[in-house]
Regions:
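Basic helix-turn-helix/winged-helix DNA-binding cores
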Residues: 273-274
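NTP-dependent nucleotidyl-transfer catalytic core
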Residues: 1-253, 257-268, 282, 328, ...
Length: 406
């Protein structure tokens, strides 16, 4: 049994008690990819994926890429690169980085643009059910049918709203405004009501929205629909960085309830990585890129080990010392695993599995391998007790459970 921290209940839970595990991790908006904050999040859920597989579960992992969104459009305008080209470039770079870092790819990886027809149907369904409403648009917006207006979710139709993040009203209002919300939009029933369908605006991309009119999807409904179509509703777990807890996961779960049977049973969040004293973020520009480290000749497995040295729920600051420690650990492990025989690995494997089963405790798992490596490299150890093939057993376990290729 793999127990993880459920952000909604602040308890450790078995997120997938049956023979299957279905989970969704919110993907990137493809500009400034892939920084170490991204990598830390996706390596966290890769550990969970591996632990579930090792436990014998049939795992289905679904993710998305938000390949049309305001920040992407703003970056494209600022750089003069067409937004589709920018999204494609950054998405491919993200794929390359994840492959280099040993992250198992999702079974289904859907772009926001690709999901537009499904989102249109979902928003129409919410309108018909009274879970959404139209808001008039400003002059010049709305294309050939401005009277249709933008569409917003009506949170008053969801009595369970707020149960994911469990925040007070003032905190929700503050975070909603900080993280892409529009609390002051005229015509909304409630300041927190989130956008479902944004009507066409001059200079912005738009798609056929059938009865909604031309436009593009809101952020939260995209993930709700992609998760529904890839996993079915409800599903076991939704994850991402802790900054997605509210409003994104709160809103997408609310939308999933409006679409029928609810969203994720468990919400799991990775802590944020800081750099130069601030959270690593695109807006601040204090980013360390996986691709830049790779281009500088850094072994991706050293990057992975540097990230795994911190518990996924902790918030911490990246420094050069983290990378140096990752490189040193990688070199020591490779040295310890170079022989045909070595110390018995039975307890080491059990310790790795136990650590991951206890809230994905990667530092403890690394410590178990360190202890085996220290013994293997000890020139004074009793080699008469060595087990033939033990280094291979440890190497395969490190690969399968920790995602570190040696």
């Amino acid at each position: 049994m793999v127990r993880v921290h459920d952000s909604s209940t602040d308890t450790l839970v078995d997120a997938a008690p049956g023979p299957t595990a279905r989970f969704y991790v919110c993907g990137i908006t493809p500009y400034d990819a892939t920084h170490l904050g991204h990598a830390n999040t996706y390596i966290t859920f890769d550990l969970l994926h591996r632990a579930w597989r090792d436990a014998g579960k049939a795992v289905t992992y679904v993710s998305n890429v938000t390949d049309v969104d305001d920040p992407l459009l703003e970056r494209a305008a600022a750089t003069g690169v067409p937004w589709r080209e920018l999204a494609a470039q950054q998405t491919e770079l993200y794929r390359e980085d994840m492959t280099a870092l040993g992250v198992i790819p999702p079974a289904t990886w859907t772009g926001a643009v690709e999901s537009v027809p499904a989102v249109v149907g979902a928003v129409e369904e919410m309108l018909a059910a009274g879970a959404a409403y139209r808001v008039p648009v400003e002059p010049g917006a709305g294309g050939s049918a401005p009277e249709l207006g933008d569409v917003y979710a009506d949170l008053s139709a969801d009595p369970a709203f707020g149960q994911v993040a469990r925040l007070d009203g003032a905190t929700m209002a503050e975070l909603f405004a900080e993280r892409g919300g529009d609390p002051a939009r005229e015509g909304k029933k409630h300041p927190l009501d989130p956008l479902l369908w944004r009507r066409e605006r001059p200079g912005e991309p738009a798609w056929d929205g059938a009865t909604l009119g031309t436009g593009r999807p809101g952020w939260h409904i995209e993930c709700a629909v992609i998760a529904r179509d890839g996993l079915g509703l409800p599903f076991d777990l939704q994850g991402g960085g802790v900054d997605l807890l509210f409003p994104h996961h709160e809103m997408s779960t609310s939308h999933a309830r409006a679409l029928g049977k609810g969203g994720a049973a468990v919400h799991l969040h990775a802590g944020l990585v800081a750099y130069q004293g601030e959270k690593m973020s695109k807006s601040r520009g204090n980013l360390v890129f996986v691709s830049a480290l790779r281009e500088a000749g850094v072994d991706p497995m050293a990057i992975r080990l540097a990230l795994l040295a911190h518990h996924y729920r902790h918030e911490w600051e990246w420094t050069d010392a983290d990378l140096a420690a990752g490189e040193a650990r990688l070199a020591r492990w490779r040295s310890a695993l170079s022989g045909n025989g070595g110390p018995d690995a039975t307890e080491t494997l059990a310790a790795i599995r136990a650590a991951l089963a206890d809230d994905l405790d990667a530092p403890a798992a690394l410590g178990a391998v360190d202890a085996w490596a220290d013994l293997a490299l000890d020139p004074e150890r009793d080699v008469t007790t060595d087990v033939e093939g033990a280094p291979g057993i440890v190497a395969r376990a490190i690969d399968a459970l920790l995602g570190v290729r040696l």
